[in-house]
């Protein structure tokens, strides 16, 4: 396996500093809301990570809202990795997860 190729995987506790860095970057631009580390740890199981060469280059969360409804949240891609389809791949991954969970509607 090529260790520099983009990999999608579930988030781990080691990812929280990188997740915080991405969210803080976009929160400072007024695009996302700031999140505390406590909130990030609480929602860690909802997050999918895009990793390349050992670096987190994107995040996306799937939050189950109700029995038939889920929401795509916290989609963020490192500015240096824009234009490469990373956000699209992250959304596709959470859509697959929503289907696996038999969620009928996705926002």
Where in the sequence are the language-model features?
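Conserved N-terminal entry element of GNAT/NAT acetyltransferase domains
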Residues: 1-13
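Short glycine-enriched loop/turn motifs at secondary-structure junctions
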Residues: 2-4, 41-42, 102
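Acetyl-CoA-dependent GNAT
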Residues: 10-17, 21-73, 78, 91-92
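Conserved acetyl-CoA pyrophosphate-binding loop and the N-cap/start of the following alpha-helix
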Residues: 81, 85-93, 103
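Conserved GNAT acetyl-CoA-binding A-motif
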Residues: 97-107
């Amino acid at each position: 396996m090529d260790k520099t190729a983009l990999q999608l995987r579930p988030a781990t506790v080691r990812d929280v500093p990188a997740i915080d860095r991405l969210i803080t970057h976009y929160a400072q631009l007024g695009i996302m809301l700031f999140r505390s580390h406590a909130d990030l740890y609480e929602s860690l199981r909802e997050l999918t990570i895009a990793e390349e060469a050992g670096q987190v280059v994107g995040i996306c969360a799937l939050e189950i809202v109700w029995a038939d409804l889920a929401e795509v949240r916290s989609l963020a891609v490192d500015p240096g990795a824009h234009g490469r389809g990373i956000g699209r791949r992250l959304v596709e991954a959470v859509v697959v997860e929503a289907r696996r969970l038999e969620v009928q509607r996705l926002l």
